[in-house]
Curated annotation (Swiss-Prot):
Taxonomic source organism: Arabidopsis thaliana
Domain Pentapeptide repeat: 116-155, 156-196
Designated name of the protein: Thylakoid lumenal 15 kDa protein 1, chloroplastic
GO cellular component, one term: chloroplast
Protein location: Plastid, Chloroplast thylakoid lumen
SUPFAM superfamilies: Pentapeptide repeat-like
Pfam families on file: Pentapeptide
Transit sequence range: 1-34, 35-81
Transmembrane annotation, as ranges: none
Main location: plastid
C-alpha cells in the first residue's frame, strides 16, 4: 500500500465529505482515487490505481539495481578484472588455480600471479618481466626460454621447474624460495640475490650457457 504524506502525487477525494447539493453523484462518479484517514492522520490511497503506482515503483527499483550492478562491474579494480591480471594480462591470474594452463609465448609483463597454483603450467618463451610469483606454487612448471628479468619469486615453490635458458636477471628469490630438482641449464642468474644455501645447491647442478645473453650459468651464480 502506498502512503502519501505532505505532497501527494494525486488529489484524493475524502470519502467522508458530503456530496454537493448541485451534483450529488459527481464525486462518486468522477473521482479515480479515494482516500481514508489512517490512525496517524495520513491519507492512504485506496483506489485501484495503487497497483499501477506499486508496479511503477518496482520497475524503477529494478532499473536502479541494474544500473548499480553495471557501474560496479565497470569500475572494478583493474588488478582483478577479467583483462586486468597485469598490464598485458589475458585473464585473472592472482590467487587462482591455473595448473596446466598454457601461457607459452605470451607477453605477460608485470603479470600478477601472487599465491596462484601454477603446477605444470607452460610459460615457455613467455615475456614475464617484472611478473610476481610471490608465494605461488610453480611445481613442475615450464619456464624454459622465458624472460623473467625482475620477476618476484619470493616464497615461491620452484621445485622441479624447467628453467632451461631462462633469463632471471635481477629477479627476487628471497625467503624460502625452493629450486629443488629444477633444471637450470643455461639459466642466467645475473644479479639475483641468493642465500648462501640456495647458491650452494644451484652451483651443484649449474651448467650451460644462456642462448640469449651468452652468459654461463655458473658464472652468473658466482660459483667457485
Amino acid at each position: 500500500m502506498v502512503i502519501l504524506s505532505n505532497v501527494s502525487l494525486f488529489s484524493c477525494c475524502n470519502i467522508s465529505q458530503k456530496p454537493s447539493l448541485f451534483s450529488p453523484s459527481s464525486r462518486s462518479s468522477h473521482c479515480p482515487i479515494r482516500c481514508s484517514q489512517s490512525q496517524e492522520g495520513k491519507e492512504v490511497v485506496t483506489s485501484p490505481l495503487r497497483s499501477v503506482v506499486w508496479s511503477l515503483g518496482e520497475e524503477v527499483s529494478k532499473r536502479s539495481l541494474f544500473a548499480l550492478v553495471s557501474a560496479s562491474l565497470f569500475f572494478v579494480d583493474p588488478a582483478l578484472a577479467f583483462k586486468g591480471g597485469g598490464p598485458y594480462g589475458q585473464g585473472v591470474t592472482r590467487g587462482q588455480d591455473l595448473s596446466g594452463k598454457d601461457f607459452s609465448g605470451q607477453t605477460l609483463i608485470r603479470q600478477d600471479f601472487k599465491t596462484s597454483i601454477l603446477r605444470q603450467a607452460n610459460f615457455k618463451g613467455a615475456k614475464l618481466l617484472g611478473a610476481s610469483f610471490f608465494d605461488a606454487d610453480l611445481t613442475g612448471a615450464d619456464l624454459s626460454e622465458a624472460d623473467l628479468r625482475g620477476a618476484d619469486f619470493s616464497l615461491a615453490n620452484v621445485t622441479k621447474v624447467n628453467l632451461t635458458n631462462a633469463n632471471l636477471e635481477g629477479a627476487t628469490v628471497t625467503g624460502n624460495t625452493s629450486f629443488k630438482g629444477s633444471n637450470i641449464t643455461g639459466a642466467d642468474f645475473t644479479d639475483v640475490p641468493l642465500r648462501d644455501d640456495q647458491r650452494v645447491y644451484l652451483c651443484k647442478v649449474a651448467d650451460g650457457v644462456n642462448a640469449t645473453t651468452g652468459n654461463a650459468t655458473r658464472d652468473t651464480l658466482l660459483c667457485n
